[in-house]
UniProtKB/Swiss-Prot annotation:
Subcellular location as annotated: Cellular thylakoid membrane
Membrane topology per record: Multi-pass membrane protein
Transmembrane segments: 34-54, 68-88
Protein name: Photosystem I assembly protein Ycf4
Classification lineage: Bacteria, Bacillati, Cyanobacteriota, Cyanophyceae, Synechococcales
Encoding gene per record: ycf4
UniProt keywords, alphabetically: Membrane, Photosynthesis, Thylakoid, Transmembrane, Transmembrane helix
InterPro entries on file: PSI_Ycf4_assembly
Length: 191
């Protein structure tokens, strides 16, 4: 047997003992759109404010130089500054891919490792697999729907492990929960 086939065989054996799930973060189309709109709107309001202060048109549309600086130009400048600062925050979240990470269930080591990208540092949690009692599916409909997979852990609160954001379809949620429960050989609750 060649070394190449031995390595692929050992990878297959390891894949049966390790389950790894990638979690998407804040790099979503909706976040890019919001950050872009805030940037464009913030710059537009700031330019309108500067136009009213200096008496020159810095914007190609309209005639903002005719605005009275106090109070209209000043308020537009404050709105522009607030939008621009919020846009910087959104671009920072997108840049670091806030919330992304990995769920790694490793039967070799007997450990569940969760890692997520935080705003200022990465968050890493390790829990022994034998402390996991069940996989729980949480579904709440209504104005603020909730659909997530969480783990029931001995002596602790439930630990959510699915991504935050728009609700997943129920079939995907059930399949994800069933895959984890089958791998860990624990019960699946909440169906």
């Amino acid at each position: 047997m060649s070394s190449e086939s031995k390595s692929s065989q050992s990878e297959k054996e390891l894949s049966g003992l390790v389950l790894e799930q990638k979690i998407k973060g804040s790099r979503k189309v909706s976040n890019y759109l919001v950050a872009s709109m805030l940037s464009i709107g913030g710059v537009g309001f700031l330019l309108a404010s500067f136009s009213s202060y200096f008496g020159r048109d810095f914007l190609p549309l309209g005639n903002p130089s005719t605005l009275i600086f106090v109070p209209q130009g000043l308020v537009m400048g404050l709105y522009g500054l607030a939008a621009f600062l919020l846009a910087i925050y959104f671009w920072r979240l997108i840049n670091i891919d806030y919330g992304s990470g990995v769920n790694r269930f490793d039967k070799n080591k007997g450990v569940l490792s969760l890692s997520r990208r935080g705003l200022f540092k990465n968050i890493e949690i390790e829990i022994p697999i034998d402390e996991i009692k069940a996989v729980k599916l949480e579904v709440r409909e209504g104005f603020n729907p909730l659909r997530r997979v969480s783990l029931r852990i001995k002596g602790r609160k439930d630990l959510p492990i699915s991504r935050v954001g728009s609700p997943k379809p129920l079939l995907d949620l059930e399949n994800e929960g069933a895959e984890i429960a089958r791998f860990l050989e624990v019960n699946l609750e909440g169906i």
